[in-house]
Amino acid sequence: ALIPGQPTPRSALTYLAVETVLQAVDRLEVRGRDSAGLSVWVHLDEADRALLAGSLAGRADPLLRSGSAVVTGDGVCFVYKHAAIVGKLGDNGTALRLALRDDADLHAVLALPSAAVTVLAHTRWASVGRISEANAHPVDSRIAGADDAGPFSIAALNGDIDNYGALAKQVSYEPDERGITTDAKVIPVLLSQRLAQDADPGSALCACLGDFAGSMAIAAQSETGDEVLLAVKGSGQSLYVGLGHGGFVVASEVYGLVATTSRYLRVGGAAWPGATRQGTVLALPRRGSGTLAAIRRWDGDGVLRPVEPAEVRTAEVTTRDLALDSAVHYLHKEIHEAPSSFRKTLRGRLRQGAAGVQVGLPPSSLPTEVRRRISDGRVREIVVVGQGTAAVAAQGVAQFLRAAVGDRLVLTAMPASEFSASCLRPDMTDVCVIAISQSGTTTDTNRSVDLAKDRGAAILSIVNRRDSDLTTKSHGVLYTSDGRDVEMSVASTKAFYAQVAAGCLLAIELGRELDVLTPEREASLIDGLQRIPGQLLALQESEELLAKIAADVAARYPYWAVVGSGHNRVAAAEIRIKLSELCYKTISTDAVEDKKHIDLSAEALVLVCVAGAPPGQVSDLVKEVEILAAHGNTPIVLCDEGTEQSWPTDLVVGLPLGHPEMMWIVATAAGHLFAYHAARRIDAVAEPLRVALARLEGAVDHGLELSAALPREVLVPVIDVLEDADRGHLRGVLTSETALGLARLVLQPARPGLGPEAFSFQATQPVDLARVVLARAIDEVGRPIDSVKHQAKTVTVGTSRDDADVYDNDVVVAMRDAGVDLHRLTLPVLRVVRAQARVIKRVTGVTYYRVGGAEEAGTIRVVRKTGSAAGLASRADHGAPLMGSKRRVAELHTARLLRGRSDGRVVLVVPEQDCNRLSHLCVVHVELHERCAPRDLVAAMDSAGDRMAEIVAAVTETVPSFEPARLGELPAEDVLLAPVEWLAERLAAG
């Protein structure tokens, strides 16, 4: 317990706040736990501050390590930290609680009448700076040997500050390998310097954010006020501000705050509309804490952005979802929850009919109108899309659809990003898109759905999260499980099975609707579905065998492959994803029969999925496995229970029997379990190296000189790893470069010539060198399992398909109606047309010309006229030379907005190409909006040339600056087409 003795009601609330933050750390450390820190900033009135005079002087620490205390202008800041390269989830929280419990000074200060606290904590996956108490966050603004330039400040960081080195020089901070080397250090230093200039805290952090490069989330505090400052920049990080009855709770993931409140405000790092810089900054004061009205918010430019009530969201995850129970990792827990997820997906969707059990989907899942469009033939094609694991689930759903509806519909499965890139048509009213997403917020999938729906496609979605973005875009929704089946692990498992279950239900329903499925066939498929949960449960009895095989082979083989045939191609594809995600392997996947034609000589570890194979195919598959084994490969076979003796390998796992067409689902589950245990085996290789690094850092903290030889206790674990490598056990995970680096550390004391200069690493001292070598080795073989390394180190985004809407404007429609072949319009031309369409009020007509001869001396002839152009005589009605503005468009190969010299008509001239040769010109007669938004005018000018730059240059010849907002005050036609000098005079005159 944190509370000593009998606390006052006021201090009891304080201890509750501290424990709330510690519980959030406990939940968040699944994403990183090599160190953690917590500050308790106690705000005191003047009388209580006087009582502290000199009492905490002995706790000053320039490195702000655990147990340090800093007396500030408004109270005192206590700091507690724990760093452990070797450890498990929960260790950091335990260490911090013990330090807090045993701190008599803290308890005495919290008992003072005026004491009020803010608590800031952080759990770290180190990317910059060694793992140590000094580098654990929060860090402070003080620089050893320098006078304090401004108010005392502290900060914690998620993400990386890419220009940390340059900023450290700017603030005259020299990182010390014995001290603080994390990039987070520049945050409080810069913030303090900004505050010294009398800046408002929020404005000061906005200014700092503009100096930082990278993707980051920041929490900071200063003695200039009692508010906590937050900042987010870039697309790789976010923060969530929980609105609780007792105050604000902030976390980098929603599950960090749900124990206190389910209501939250998300803080993202993208640029606000109209802002020139990315980022958002918030100030959370103690007064009004927990209320939306108390929050102040700025964009990256420092402009206030009020918080609206409509921005508040409700979390779906609960504390129950966060409990690990007896599992070591969330991934393992979630694989074991798969039978329940599958069963919940079937529940309520199977009904007893006259002919037995039947699928019965409600109109909310399969709307009546969509059902009619499919049954009467208006829908002729179904496309199943998803991204990542959901894209593989889409392949499985498409298989069930083929089995259920036969050739009545064209069936395709593909990644959503590919669908939006190459498969969209102007008219998609004959298409039904089935979109699969665990979260309902996948960028690629949702963008594809938007584009298909705009073109008339029917949209059905299979999604886990209720009220998510995808559900609002869909005509019908099939929720997986109970619509809120949370996955904490980054690698998705149980959602995959549930998505397949929902897709199979939909396939059976459509098969009956189209009168393709016989009652017997439907009953067989439904029976197979109902047996899957039991099979998944029975599979867990084979986990010990899967774990043993993984322990024997996972670290031995550098090359891996997963193969399958028929339905098992889907299993192979999904197992490949999990093996790649968890084990950081580049893995191939092929049909079993193709493997011998591709890389048979790789001597690889090959996972062979053959469960449910037709009896007539089994003997052929056995021969394929024999060929693999004969060429030095190591096959692991996932087959039907009872056939284990048929396969020419000792590594065989029999799977619980079920419907042959659904055995691939069970094979996938077996592959997931194998992937989990393979990752654990690989990660175990890193454990002795973590021990070595922890011992080294401990020795440094206790005075080991950087130039000293490495202690024997550091080298012993390294020797153990090298001996394992010498036996061939680590050939698949330890590169030769890393192994040589480790060997040189061991040989260095006996071979003086193998000092730091013998390495390619930039290290000048033996201890520095050992840090680099050990850290690289740990990074090479460490496997976090519930997290994915690249998601912690880099920015991950989805495709936005910004150019997928280039056909979605009235100008393109008018050209199409006039006979223009839209496929002959280049993407740069379409982008210009899209930009110009934003300033065009309406299209009045089109003149379509054919271009003949060489472009330099070609001719044009009218092919077709529409609208207002139909009554206009043209010199090219019977052919004429290509000249004037049309010739200029032909030379530039880009669209141009022009005004006729004689008639004053405004037209958009668009070139059409055939095999890179100009074939046609389309002159679109248009009427512009009287006034346009400045951003639309700028976009139109920038799309087709440098007119905007010319305007700015001309205006600033006579006035010091130019504000683009002025463009909106003038007629759009003048802005876009009037002579630049004339326009500049009007703008300069104001």
Q: Which ranges hold each PLM region?
A:
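A SIS-like phosphosugar-recognition module
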Residues: 224, 235-239, 244-347, 352-990
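Conserved short alpha-helical segments that host acidic/polar catalytic motifs at enzyme active sites
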Residues: 1-380, 519, 537-543, 549
